[in-house]
């Protein structure tokens, strides 16, 4: 039987003129979901809501069957360890090196010794080809190097749920292949779950089990990879054509 990991139940939220209106969806353990839509659609509220950065005004968000708003302090700490969040601006600490940024969650949320933390960081540095810049601070990094550093930090605690937010947009796709290969190897199969929030859903066809599209705070398409590729939905068809003609209102 499928095990539900995350659920939105009629979630309503407004922030900076963008809103979600009674949005509901579920994510099972081991399932990968792409959430997309135009600007002002509400897609950019999803990850901050899950991460607890912003708060919803109606409905509930459940993690492993428990409403996150009712978490005790210890449950909230466990939830944060279970959650890996790669933000669209990468969120690197400016006065820390690549190595220090990657090690940060391990220092605060693991029982590893200093040597154990170094071993984990060394593994990420080798896997992601960061040896040449491990002592650089973010200001010296190429955009692809910043992405790889933020990605390593997001997955350092081996979380059950990963949020990848617009992480490829503005990237050189050749240089980003190292991260994409790592995602495929680590998360496409198994019991980890990934939510990709993006304006470019076609990039994630090989990774995703399901696709969900928002427009003006409401779900207008939800389906499997095959449903997405057929594009029978009028909102989806307009979006994939980048057309001004269709049911969506263009800003």
Listing of model-derived features with the role each one plays in the protein:
Residues 226-251:
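C-terminal boundary and immediately downstream tail of ABC-type ATPase nucleotide-binding domains
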Residues 59-69, 79:
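Conserved ABC transporter NBD signature motif
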Residues 137-145:
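Conserved ABC ATPase signature
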Residues 115-133:
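Conserved ABC ATPase "signature" region
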Residues 51:
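Helix-to-loop junction immediately C-terminal to a conserved catalytic motif
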